[in-house]
């Protein structure tokens, strides 16, 4: 008789994420580089290791675990994964949400800039930087439907 595989506990998921994050920090040599380069390397790592997948019935697609461990996520998974790295390096960041989308704001070089890993991801393991560290004005020039957020929560954000 086969046994049904059990889902990992929350503690096990956290441990797996922590182990992977430590490996990524080492692999990408993140400790002795400037914040802009860190952000770019983390952005690219997540995009190279995550597939956008809203069709699975797995709740983990909404979390960093889905993005970093399982390799499948929706916008909240991308944003959560990115935030973990930003928090480790004490780079100020905020998760921003509209009615049905989520992305990040990062404070770098004296400015709050938007970064949307989900929208920088594309099929066939390719990605671009259209939503990489952009101002609010640039964000709104690219999209106003999914990125319409309540700006009053982010008064200082550009």
Predicted regions span which residues?
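Hydrophobic/aromatic-rich core segments of domains that either
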Residues: 76-139
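Leloir-type glycosyltransferase catalytic cores
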Residues: 133-158
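Secondary-structure boundary elements
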Residues: 7-67
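Extended, well-ordered protein cores
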Residues: 1-4
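Hydrophobic (often cysteine-bearing) scaffold residues that line and stabilize catalytic clefts
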Residues: 17, 38, 74, 78, ...
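Generic structural motif
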Residues: 12, 92-96, 149-152
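Repeated polar recognition positions within modular binding domains
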Residues: 53-57, 70-71, 120-128
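A short, highly charged nucleic-acid-interacting micro-segment common to nuclease
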Residues: 64-77
């Amino acid at each position: 008789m086969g046994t049904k595989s059990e889902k990992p506990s929350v503690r096990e998921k956290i441990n797996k994420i922590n182990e992977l994050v430590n490996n990524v920090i080492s692999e990408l040599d993140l400790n002795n580089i400037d914040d802009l380069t860190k952000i770019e390397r983390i952005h690219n790592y997540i995009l190279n290791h995550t597939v956008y997948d809203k069709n699975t019935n797995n709740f983990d697609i909404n979390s960093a675990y889905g993005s970093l461990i399982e390799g499948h996520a929706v916008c909240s998974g991308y944003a959560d994964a990115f935030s973990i790295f930003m928090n480790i390096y004490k780079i100020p960041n905020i998760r921003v949400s509209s009615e049905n989308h989520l992305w990040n704001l990062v404070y770098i070089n004296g400015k709050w800039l938007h970064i949307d890993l989900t929208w920088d991801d594309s099929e066939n393991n390719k990605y671009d930087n259209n939503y990489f560290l952009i101002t609010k004005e640039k964000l709104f020039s690219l999209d106003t439907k999914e990125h319409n957020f309540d700006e009053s929560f982010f008064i200082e954000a550009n």
